[in-house]
């Protein structure tokens, strides 16, 4: 099963769900879609999941596809899954700024996620993930420091 989550954000993420809809070729999909209007064909769908339900789906999944929300990414990582991350983009009206893009790029450079900025690359990323699953992420001091630095910068930008 491929688990797709748009997180608990109140904004729609139709771009991701439209790309997932194109995968609906018999692929076993569970999609947490939030307020988005698209329901991928053939997928089992839910508006929202409890934290425990989300963790269970991540543990069951062969691949996790998520927005680049820090909570969703860290939940996947803490449950031994290196997620495929599609950031919400400011220029497309999906976010108020590009914090998800910056976080996704930083997490990818640290080897924590597979970043897909253009949803045209999503099928390939999923196929590669399923053919040769990446090893579970192993936090190290550099990673912890990178995340701490990124979060400190992000909070500083919001306060400043």
Locate predicted features.
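Donor-nucleotide binding loops and adjacent catalytic segments primarily
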Residues: 1-60, 101
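Residues at secondary-structure transition points
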Residues: 11, 49-59, 67, 94-98, ...
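Short active-site oxyanion
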Residues: 28, 60-64, 111-113
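Short acidic-hydrophobic, aromatic-tinged amphipathic segments that line or gate anion-handling sites
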Residues: 45-48, 113-122
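A donor-sugar binding/catalytic signature common to diverse glycosyltransferases
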Residues: 54-94
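Catalytic binding pocket for nucleotide-activated donors in carbohydrate/polymer assembly enzymes
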Residues: 82-117
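C-terminal amphipathic helix plus adjacent low-complexity
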Residues: 124, 128-160
């Amino acid at each position: 099963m491929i688990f797709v989550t748009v997180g608990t954000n109140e904004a729609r993420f139709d771009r991701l769900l439209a790309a997932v809809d194109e995968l609906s070729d018999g692929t076993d999909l569970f999609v947490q879609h939030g307020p988005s209007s698209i329901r991928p064909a053939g997928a089992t769908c839910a508006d929202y999941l409890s934290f425990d339900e989300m963790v269970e789906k991540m543990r069951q999944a062969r691949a996790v596809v998520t927005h680049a929300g820090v909570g969703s990414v860290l939940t996947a990582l803490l449950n031994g899954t290196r997620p495929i991350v599609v950031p919400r983009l400011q220029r497309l009206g999906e976010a108020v700024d590009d914090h998800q893009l910056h976080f996704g790029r930083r997490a990818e450079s640290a080897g924590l996620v597979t970043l897909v900025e253009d949803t045209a690359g999503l099928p390939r990323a999923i196929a590669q993930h399923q053919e040769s699953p990446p090893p579970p992420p192993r936090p190290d001091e550099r990673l912890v420091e990178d995340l701490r630095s990124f979060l400190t910068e992000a909070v500083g930008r919001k306060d400043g």
